[in-house]
Amino acid sequence: MHKHDPDGTRLPIKIDSTSNGEYEPIPISALNEQANHLALQQAEQNSRRLQQTRRKFLISSCGAASTLLAFNQANAYAGKRGGYFDLHPDAGLDRFAAAEQLEGNEFIFDVQGHYVNPEGDWLGQLPESARPYAQMEKASCEAASEPGSRAYLNCLSADEFIKDVFLDSDTDIMVLSFVPSTREREPVTIEDADATRQIVADLQGSKRLMIHGRVNPNQEGDLEAMDELAANWDISAFKTYTQYGPGGVGFFLHDEAGIAMIERAQRLGVRNICVHKGLPFGPQSYEHSQCSDIGIVAKRFPDMNFLVYHSGFVATVQEQAFAAGAGRDGIDTLIQSLIDNAVAPNANVYAELGSSWRFLMRDPDNAAHALGKLFRYVGEDNVLWGTDSIWYGSPQDQIQAFRSFQISQEFQDRFGYPVITPGMRRKVFGLNAARPYGISEEEIRLHTAVDSVAQRKTNYLNDPQPSFLTYGPRNRREFLNFLNWGG
């Protein structure tokens, strides 16, 4: 019995307008709409040929392959030549061909995950009549029918988080990160994050969840709070937002506040600084969302790691081949900063793909330029896997799309981009992040292969129930409501 979408109207690869709440949702293009329509048509045809219901077909590897092949067809018809999903033409019908290209045993370490505590203190700051997140797709899950005016928040529970991330996807480890906020307005606090980590750990002690410590050094009390975060919460990095601050004014990492944060982290023995760059919140303090400061601090602090979350990607910028000195926005601000400060590829700057890859899945030309430039200038050892889930629902569709995406031969020849090899995919999926986060893949595999999450997944896959739903806002009204709730 299918608990979710019994009629099979939801595609397993989710190309839609959902945002992570840090930027206003951007509608998908007419081409994306056509591709989604074609994918549903082909799902209907292929499910009939295989004598399956459309829902049963769509939750299979063939369903994902059929969807990606439909995207290829629509993109090719529109003249998109930069990249494609490298799948056998029969993968939409042949489960072995689909499995060969969309299933895998890579070590997958998602360095950017999010969780909202449905019972957190933040609810007490809202009017009793408020129904935060009620309009999100995910709020329509089965748990929403339980008693209580806010029962739908159970759809955001730790159990649902575990299902989306560890049962419905191939993710092995995730880092819980934080949204920009003050301590008083955090939708998930350090205590919430630790409690969620403990829920997973209690399943059998495996280290499947790690956490960041949120700090904005231009905010009163945040610098001093770093000591307590490092001492008491076993954090793996400090996470900061340079476009965020009092009165909407941000900071640069090489400003006094930024340097104070880096030096304090250094003294505390926390070598990872995770910084949101790109995906600007709006026009105010826009320059602080760009990456000009990254190369400066990377050169000044060679013993520190700077993990650039979103890689400086700007959704409204069409990525193209890098041109030194052209002053282009987006990922090029990161590349230019590295070049200006003689920071070599595969040094102490890392480019993370959360939200960026999800958006790049819309346009294979954009994806080819973005990935090609990151591999070339940041280094194939320093590109990190992140998905920004739960906002985009289960990250499995992002995993499947990345497993199969390839830069075209034309773009390789014209722009010097590399072919994406299986070895490079393994690096991006987890091996690259294992270094700054101090994780041994072998150790993690040893624990996660036999822990209770793995056992639950084995049982779950006998009757999988992926929802193919998202959590984040999908339009301006939902986005503004999200901001009002402290998102």
Question: What is each of the regions a protein language model found here?
Answer:
Residues 116-119, 181-184, 218-221, 245-247, ...:
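Active-site environment of divalent metal-dependent phosphoester hydrolases
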Residues 89-92, 173, 178-289:
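Active-site gating/metal-coordination segments in enzymes
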Residues 38-59, 67-95:
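N-terminal twin-arginine translocation
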Residues 106, 124-203:
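Alpha-helical scaffold segments that flank or form the walls of functional sites
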Residues 51-69, 94-99, 107, 123, ...:
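Mid-to-C-terminal alpha-helical segments outside catalytic/metal-binding sites
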Residues 1-52:
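N-terminal secretory signal peptides
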Residues 236-237, 247-385, 410-419, 468-486:
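Catalytic pocket-lining loop regions of alpha/beta-barrel enzymes
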